[in-house]
Swiss-Prot record:
It comes from Sinorhizobium medicae (strain WSM419) (Ensifer medicae). It comes from the Bacteria. The lineage of its organism: Bacteria, Pseudomonadati, Pseudomonadota, Alphaproteobacteria, Hyphomicrobiales. Channel that opens in response to stretch forces in the membrane lipid bilayer. May participate in the regulation of osmotic pressure changes within the cell. It is found in: Cell inner membrane. Keywords: Cell inner membrane, Cell membrane, Ion channel, Ion transport, Membrane, Transmembrane, Transmembrane helix, Transport. The chain crosses the membrane at residues 14-34, 82-102. This is Large-conductance mechanosensitive channel. InterPro entries: Mechanosensitive_channel_CS, MS_channel, MSC/AndL, MscL_channel. It is a multi-pass membrane protein. One of its GO terms (cellular component) is plasma membrane. Its main location: membrane. The gene is mscL. Pfam families: MscL (PF01741).
Amino acid sequence: MLNEFKEFIARGNVMDLAVGVIIGAAFSKIVDSVVNDLVMPVVGALTGGGFDFSDYFLPLSGNVTAQTLAAAREQGAVFAYGNFITVFINFLILAWIIFLLIKLVNRARASVEREKAPEPAAPPPQDILLLSEIRDLLKQRA
């Protein structure tokens, strides 16, 4: 059973999946940085200057009077929809980047396949076709 497990792990698909998961984890940090350090400041500047979605919340308790999410959570229950907005924007950016990467890879594969594809053979000349028909007819009579 141990040998079967070793064979399973050594397969290309499992190794490719492992590499993909590791790269995906690292890529997630890059996307988080793009969203938090590049996109969100621009969104904040366009919408009135320097606000942060993470402090958007609705108090679910009458005791909550704080202006920041961390302080509001200490006072009572809150509906922290700002974090959801940030995560959703993060997801959209990640999905867009993955879409562009897949499109780029598919385009590269298609160009490589076009280069590898042999030119279709030119049809034989009419005289060769005629001679082939005559040969076939002679074989049938014999």
